[in-house]
């Protein structure tokens, strides 16, 4: 089975899963879509200028790692607040929201290419996947690639703990990433 998994939480990532293995991923810490408080991919020349603007390394990391993304536009990392502003028609919120949807759609398309467009499903996970219209807006771009599966919720820590337990019990080997 080949999947594109879109983790839509505080951090955002879009991964290509080919027959049970992650073969590529766009992750908000380094590239791809912005997240709620992370910048995602940035224009290199502007980034270089910012890094040499007198800011310390810690200031630059804090800006792009905790004060960027949707937070830099709307002053919040709460996606429910962002969605409420979008529904109210707040122009700044609508513009930032549309940029997020567009960036995610591009990342999903890129991961489809990685899988040679042999995609069994696109999966939306984590807290932002609770928002129907958000998922619908992304799907408007990518829905022709593969069926959509929504698994909203915050199960990351439980999944990590269960995986560690399987390794400790000898039921699974620890992976190297």
Give, region by region, the residue ranges found by the protein language model.
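Predominant activation on well-ordered alpha-helical scaffold segments within soluble catalytic domains
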Residues: 44-52, 58-65, 80-83, 105, ...
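Adenine-nucleotide phosphate-binding core of ATP-dependent small-molecule kinases
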Residues: 62-117
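Glycine-rich phosphate-binding loop plus the immediately following alpha-helix
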Residues: 2-3, 11, 19, 23-79
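Glycine-rich phosphate-binding loops at beta-strand->alpha-helix junctions
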Residues: 119-138
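Short beta-strand segments
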Residues: 4-9, 125
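Glycine-rich phosphate-binding/hydrolytic loop that grips phosphoryl groups
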Residues: 129-130, 136, 147-177
């Amino acid at each position: 089975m080949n999947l594109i998994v879109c983790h839509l939480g505080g951090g955002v990532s879009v991964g290509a899963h080919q027959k049970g293995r992650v073969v590529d991923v766009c992750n908000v810490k380094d590239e791809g879509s912005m997240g709620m408080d992370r910048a995602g991919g940035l224009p290199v020349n502007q980034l270089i200028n910012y890094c040499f603007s007198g800011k310390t390394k810690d200031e630059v990391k804090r800006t792009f790692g905790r004060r960027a993304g949707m937070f830099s536009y709307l002053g919040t990392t709460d996606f429910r607040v962002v969605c409420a502003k979008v529904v109210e028609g707040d122009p700044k919120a609508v513009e930032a929201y549309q940029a997020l949807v567009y960036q995610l759609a591009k990342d999903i398309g890129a991961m489809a290419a990685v899988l040679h467009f042999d995609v069994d499903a696109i999966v939306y996970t984590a807290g932002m996947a609770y928002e129907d219209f958000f998922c619908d807006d992304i799907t408007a771009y990518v829905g022709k690639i593969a069926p959509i599966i929504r698994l909203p919720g915050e199960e990351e820590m439980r999944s990590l703990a269960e995986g560690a337990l399987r390794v400790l019990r000898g039921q699974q080997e620890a992976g190297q990433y």
